[in-house]
């Protein structure tokens, strides 16, 4: 997180807490990882009936997912001149998953100095 390197922003984090972190960072869009579980949450921090949408985007993991999907992943974030904090749908977040040779990657881990459990994590998607 912007506050601490060992703080996890899990998907079901309390909305008030997530908004506080984003407001302290002065972030309308915050992209982060660390949990290896991709998600996109749209939060409204507006007051007095005025919308102010903020986007919390966990980009997941390119090659070590922890969501039981063994494929690699990345995010395409689309922002353009019409994007606005007043319109929650004016920012597009697309999660892309792709196949790669997981067994080859796992074997490379096993042949390295890394713990073999990392290879199993690749095979299981955790």
Describe each model-derived feature in a short phrase.
Residues 1-29, 44-45:
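Conserved catalytic scaffold of divalent metal-dependent phosphoesterases
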Residues 2-4, 36-39, 63-64:
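Short, catalytically relevant binding-site loops at active-site mouths
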Residues 28-38, 56-60:
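Active-site neighborhood of phospho(di)ester-bond hydrolases with catalytic His/Asp-centered motifs
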Residues 42-126:
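Acidic, His/Gly-rich catalytic cores of divalent-metal-dependent hydrolytic chemistry
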């Amino acid at each position: 997180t912007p506050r601490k390197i060992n703080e996890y922003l899990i998907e079901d984090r309390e909305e008030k807490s997530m908004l506080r972190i984003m407001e302290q960072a002065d972030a309308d869009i915050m992209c982060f990882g660390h949990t290896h579980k991709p998600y996109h949450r749209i939060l409204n921090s507006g007051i007095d009936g005025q919308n102010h949408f903020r986007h919390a985007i966990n980009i997941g993991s390119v090659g070590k997912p922890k969501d039981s999907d063994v494929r690699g992943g990345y995010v395409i974030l689309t922002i353009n001149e019409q994007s606005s904090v007043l319109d929650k749908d004016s920012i597009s977040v697309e999660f892309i998953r792709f196949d790669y040779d997981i067994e080859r990657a796992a074997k490379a881990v096993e042949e390295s100095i890394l713990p073999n459990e990392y290879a199993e994590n690749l095979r299981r998607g955790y």
